[in-house]
Amino acid sequence: MDQTLSSFGNVFAFLALGIVFVAGGYLTARMLRPSRPNPAKNSTYECGEEAVGSAWVKFNIRFYVVALIFIIFDVEVVFLYPWATVFKSLGVFALVEVLVFAGILILGLVYAWVKGDLDWVRPEPKVPQMPVMPDRKAEGGRA
Protein backbone atom coordinates (compact mmCIF):
# COMPACT_ATOMS: atom_id res chain seq x y z
CA MET A 1 0.00 0.00 0.00
CA ASP A 2 2.82 2.41 0.87
CA GLN A 3 4.58 1.80 -2.43
CA THR A 4 1.35 2.47 -4.35
CA LEU A 5 0.86 5.79 -2.60
CA SER A 6 4.47 6.81 -3.16
CA SER A 7 4.15 5.90 -6.86
CA PHE A 8 1.05 8.06 -7.16
CA GLY A 9 2.84 10.77 -5.18
CA ASN A 10 5.57 10.79 -7.81
CA VAL A 11 2.99 11.07 -10.58
CA PHE A 12 1.16 13.93 -8.83
CA ALA A 13 4.45 15.73 -8.10
CA PHE A 14 5.44 15.41 -11.75
CA LEU A 15 2.00 16.68 -12.82
CA ALA A 16 2.16 19.65 -10.42
CA LEU A 17 5.69 20.50 -11.55
CA GLY A 18 4.59 20.38 -15.19
CA ILE A 19 1.64 22.68 -14.51
CA VAL A 20 3.85 25.14 -12.60
CA PHE A 21 6.45 25.06 -15.38
CA VAL A 22 3.92 25.76 -18.15
CA ALA A 23 2.04 28.43 -16.15
CA GLY A 24 5.33 30.09 -15.14
CA GLY A 25 6.54 30.23 -18.73
CA TYR A 26 3.22 31.62 -19.91
CA LEU A 27 3.10 34.31 -17.21
CA THR A 28 6.75 35.29 -17.74
CA ALA A 29 6.24 35.65 -21.48
CA ARG A 30 3.07 37.68 -20.91
CA MET A 31 4.85 40.10 -18.55
CA LEU A 32 7.97 40.53 -20.72
CA ARG A 33 6.48 40.85 -24.20
CA PRO A 34 5.79 44.23 -25.74
CA SER A 35 2.14 45.00 -26.30
CA ARG A 36 1.65 47.33 -29.26
CA PRO A 37 -1.53 46.31 -31.09
CA ASN A 38 -2.33 47.93 -34.43
CA PRO A 39 -4.76 47.15 -37.27
CA ALA A 40 -2.12 45.30 -39.31
CA LYS A 41 -1.35 42.93 -36.44
CA ASN A 42 -5.01 42.31 -35.71
CA SER A 43 -5.96 41.52 -39.31
CA THR A 44 -6.15 38.09 -40.93
CA TYR A 45 -2.86 36.93 -42.48
CA GLU A 46 -2.91 34.91 -45.70
CA CYS A 47 0.69 34.32 -46.82
CA GLY A 48 1.42 38.02 -47.23
CA GLU A 49 -1.59 38.62 -49.49
CA GLU A 50 -4.67 40.66 -48.80
CA ALA A 51 -7.37 38.57 -47.16
CA VAL A 52 -10.11 37.45 -49.53
CA GLY A 53 -13.47 36.74 -47.94
CA SER A 54 -14.11 35.67 -44.40
CA ALA A 55 -11.73 33.66 -42.26
CA TRP A 56 -14.66 31.48 -41.18
CA VAL A 57 -14.87 28.62 -43.64
CA LYS A 58 -17.90 26.35 -43.46
CA PHE A 59 -16.98 22.67 -43.54
CA ASN A 60 -19.33 19.89 -44.44
CA ILE A 61 -20.60 18.21 -41.27
CA ARG A 62 -19.63 14.81 -42.67
CA PHE A 63 -15.95 15.67 -42.13
CA TYR A 64 -16.64 15.98 -38.41
CA VAL A 65 -18.53 12.68 -38.27
CA VAL A 66 -15.69 10.84 -40.00
CA ALA A 67 -13.15 12.52 -37.71
CA LEU A 68 -15.10 11.54 -34.59
CA ILE A 69 -15.41 7.93 -35.71
CA PHE A 70 -11.67 7.87 -36.44
CA ILE A 71 -10.86 9.28 -32.99
CA ILE A 72 -13.11 6.72 -31.28
CA PHE A 73 -11.35 3.80 -32.95
CA ASP A 74 -7.94 5.40 -32.50
CA VAL A 75 -8.58 5.58 -28.75
CA GLU A 76 -9.70 1.95 -28.87
CA VAL A 77 -6.29 0.98 -30.23
CA VAL A 78 -4.61 3.01 -27.47
CA PHE A 79 -6.58 1.00 -24.89
CA LEU A 80 -6.02 -2.35 -26.60
CA TYR A 81 -2.24 -2.09 -26.97
CA PRO A 82 -1.38 -2.26 -23.23
CA TRP A 83 -3.89 -5.08 -22.81
CA ALA A 84 -2.28 -7.04 -25.65
CA THR A 85 1.19 -6.71 -24.14
CA VAL A 86 0.14 -8.40 -20.87
CA PHE A 87 -2.61 -10.67 -22.23
CA LYS A 88 -1.10 -13.97 -21.04
CA SER A 89 -0.86 -12.89 -17.41
CA LEU A 90 -4.40 -11.45 -17.18
CA GLY A 91 -6.45 -14.54 -17.92
CA VAL A 92 -9.89 -15.19 -19.36
CA PHE A 93 -11.68 -12.43 -17.41
CA ALA A 94 -9.59 -9.74 -19.11
CA LEU A 95 -10.32 -11.35 -22.48
CA VAL A 96 -14.06 -11.13 -21.80
CA GLU A 97 -13.70 -7.49 -20.73
CA VAL A 98 -11.90 -6.58 -23.94
CA LEU A 99 -14.44 -8.47 -26.05
CA VAL A 100 -17.27 -6.53 -24.37
CA PHE A 101 -15.37 -3.26 -24.94
CA ALA A 102 -14.77 -4.06 -28.61
CA GLY A 103 -18.36 -5.29 -28.99
CA ILE A 104 -19.76 -2.00 -27.73
CA LEU A 105 -17.58 -0.09 -30.18
CA ILE A 106 -18.58 -2.40 -33.04
CA LEU A 107 -22.26 -1.87 -32.16
CA GLY A 108 -21.64 1.88 -32.36
CA LEU A 109 -20.00 1.46 -35.75
CA VAL A 110 -22.90 -0.65 -37.01
CA TYR A 111 -25.34 1.98 -35.73
CA ALA A 112 -23.46 4.74 -37.57
CA TRP A 113 -23.39 2.59 -40.70
CA VAL A 114 -27.13 1.78 -40.59
CA LYS A 115 -27.97 5.41 -39.86
CA GLY A 116 -26.04 6.38 -43.00
CA ASP A 117 -23.34 8.47 -41.33
CA LEU A 118 -20.63 6.60 -43.22
CA ASP A 119 -22.19 7.27 -46.64
CA TRP A 120 -20.54 10.27 -48.22
CA VAL A 121 -23.36 10.88 -50.70
CA ARG A 122 -26.71 10.25 -49.09
CA PRO A 123 -29.69 9.30 -51.24
CA GLU A 124 -32.50 11.84 -51.30
CA PRO A 125 -35.41 10.76 -49.11
CA LYS A 126 -38.60 10.04 -51.01
CA VAL A 127 -41.53 11.94 -49.57
CA PRO A 128 -44.92 10.43 -50.37
CA GLN A 129 -47.11 12.83 -52.34
CA MET A 130 -50.67 13.36 -51.20
CA PRO A 131 -53.25 13.65 -53.99
CA VAL A 132 -54.73 17.13 -54.27
CA MET A 133 -58.48 17.16 -53.74
CA PRO A 134 -60.42 19.59 -55.93
CA ASP A 135 -62.01 22.50 -54.10
CA ARG A 136 -65.80 22.32 -54.43
CA LYS A 137 -66.28 25.98 -53.54
CA ALA A 138 -64.23 27.02 -56.55
CA GLU A 139 -66.48 24.89 -58.77
CA GLY A 140 -69.63 26.48 -57.37
CA GLY A 141 -70.83 23.42 -55.48
CA ARG A 142 -71.79 23.06 -51.83
CA ALA A 143 -69.18 22.28 -49.22
Swiss-Prot record:
Subcellular location, record wording: Cell inner membrane
Highest rank taxon of the organism: Bacteria
Keyword tags: Cell inner membrane, Cell membrane, Membrane, NAD, Quinone, Translocase, Transmembrane, Transmembrane helix, Transport
Positions of transmembrane segments: 8-28, 63-83, 90-110
MF annotations from Gene Ontology: NADH dehydrogenase (ubiquinone) activity; NADH:ubiquinone reductase (non-electrogenic) activity; quinone binding
EC number: 7.1.1.-
GO cellular component assignments: NADH dehydrogenase complex; plasma membrane
Disulfide topology: none
Entry annotated with the keyword S-adenosyl-L-methionine: no
Membrane topology note: Multi-pass membrane protein
Catalytic activities: a quinone + NADH + 5 H(+)(in) = a quinol + NAD(+) + 4 H(+)(out)
Subunit structure and binding partners: NDH-1 is composed of 14 different subunits. Subunits NuoA, H, J, K, L, M, N constitute the membrane sector of the complex.
Family listed: Belongs to the complex I subunit 3 family.
Task performed by this protein: NDH-1 shuttles electrons from NADH, via FMN and iron-sulfur (Fe-S) centers, to quinones in the respiratory chain. The immediate electron acceptor for the enzyme in this species is believed to be a menaquinone. Couples the redox reaction to proton translocation (for every two electrons transferred, four hydrogen ions are translocated across the cytoplasmic membrane), and thus conserves the redox energy in a proton gradient.
Family annotation (PANTHER family): NADH-UBIQUINONE OXIDOREDUCTASE CHAIN 3 (PTHR11058:SF9)
Protein name (database record): NADH-quinone oxidoreductase subunit A
